[in-house]
Amino acid sequence: MNIHRECRSLLSLIQIVSGNLPTGGFSYSKGLESAIEYGWVKSLEDFLNWQKQWIHEQLIYIDWPMLKRCYYYTKINDSKNFKKCALQILSYRDTYELRLEEQRRGKAMEKLISQWYDPISDSWAVAFKCSGLASMAWLGYEWNIPIKNLALGYAYNALESSIMVGLKLLPFGQRTAQKLLRYLVEFLPNAWDKADLVKDHEVGGNFLLQSIASACHEDQYSRLFSS
């Protein structure tokens, strides 16, 4: 029985982080498209530095700590504090496009959750619509996905999506893309250990270059991605 539960948990994790579902990230670049357009990211080294900065600034100090807190509030059925966390996540998306992406993912997740878990109270549904990350935490708990696995799956999806952006806009091919992904995921276990210890007053990152690139992307004339 436990083996079957672990299998269901693994399959649920694969589904929840899939980039091909409405909640996926392959249509977003989070400012990376503009960074490449303006020459801030023009080599593999630049690309790797961008991703590592995302891991060490945003993932460790914003995304994972907030995912963990939303997961906890789901566990204790505290919709009030869950909503506060969802709004806090949204406040950390400090450009129009980053906020819009977070809300679009949240609304897509809310529609799926409402179909699978009917009825859902308004207090939860409103929070889901605010944040895709918060919605993922709720669904991850409901699907018995351990928080560490959920966090690693989220990060893997984000890195894979960024590499897909690079694959389209930078001069490297599929084999290099696989090597990049393999290299970057090696940072994740230690990164999670750090994120797991982040206290409430320490939450908050400063990936300033991403914010600037995202703001520039709003007015970019020709673009392939939504952010």
Swiss-Prot record:
Gene3D superfamilies hit by this protein: Urease accessory protein UreF
Superkingdom of this protein's organism: Bacteria
Record's signal peptide: none
GO molecular function, one term: nickel cation binding
UniProt entry keywords in alphabetical sequence: Chaperone, Cytoplasm, Nickel insertion
Assigned GO CC terms: cytoplasm
Residues forming coiled coils: none
Compartments, record wording: Cytoplasm
Pfam families membership: UreF
Subunit structure and binding partners: UreD, UreF and UreG form a complex that acts as a GTP-hydrolysis-dependent molecular chaperone, activating the urease apoprotein by helping to assemble the nickel containing metallocenter of UreC. The UreE protein probably delivers the nickel.
Homology family: Belongs to the UreF family.
Function field: Required for maturation of urease via the functional incorporation of the urease nickel metallocenter.
PANTHER family for this protein: UREASE ACCESSORY PROTEIN F
Protein name, per record: Urease accessory protein UreF
Gene: ureF
